[in-house]
Amino acid sequence: YHLGGPPVTLKLPPGTPAGRTMRARGKGAVRKDGTRGDLLVTVDVAVPQHLSSEAREALEAYRKATADEDPRAELFKAAKGA
């Protein structure tokens, strides 16, 4: 679906999970009064099915470099505080 106007670019915060909905204020469809509504964008993460050996090596290097980090720690902390 094309809303007209230039493409919209969103900057996603690091760690944004798949399924999160982001709002781009004033970037949506044109209303009857001529103003634009908000554009809601749902993050969809595409995971490659096949990796080249170079890409696989890069991911392995990244895994080793971040071995001490637990990306789920923040999720658990947020869930306990909610």
Curated annotation (Swiss-Prot):
Biological processes per GO annotation: DNA replication; protein folding
Major location category of this protein: cytoplasm
Subcellular locations according to the entry: Cytoplasm
GO molecular function, one term: unfolded protein binding
Cofactor(s) the protein requires to work: Zn(2+)
One Pfam entry name: DnaJ_C
Record's cofactor remark: Binds 2 Zn(2+) ions per monomer.
Residue segments, region Disordered: 1-33
GO CC, any one term: cytoplasm
Keywords tagged on the record: Chaperone, Cytoplasm, DNA replication, Metal-binding, Repeat, Stress response, Zinc
Subunit structure of this chain's protein: Homodimer.
Domain notes for this protein: The J domain is necessary and sufficient to stimulate DnaK ATPase activity. Zinc center 1 plays an important role in the autonomous, DnaK-independent chaperone activity of DnaJ. Zinc center 2 is essential for interaction with DnaK and for DnaJ activity.
Protein name (Swiss-Prot/TrEMBL): Chaperone protein DnaJ 1
Organism the protein comes from: Streptomyces albus G
Encoding gene, per UniProt annotation: dnaJ1
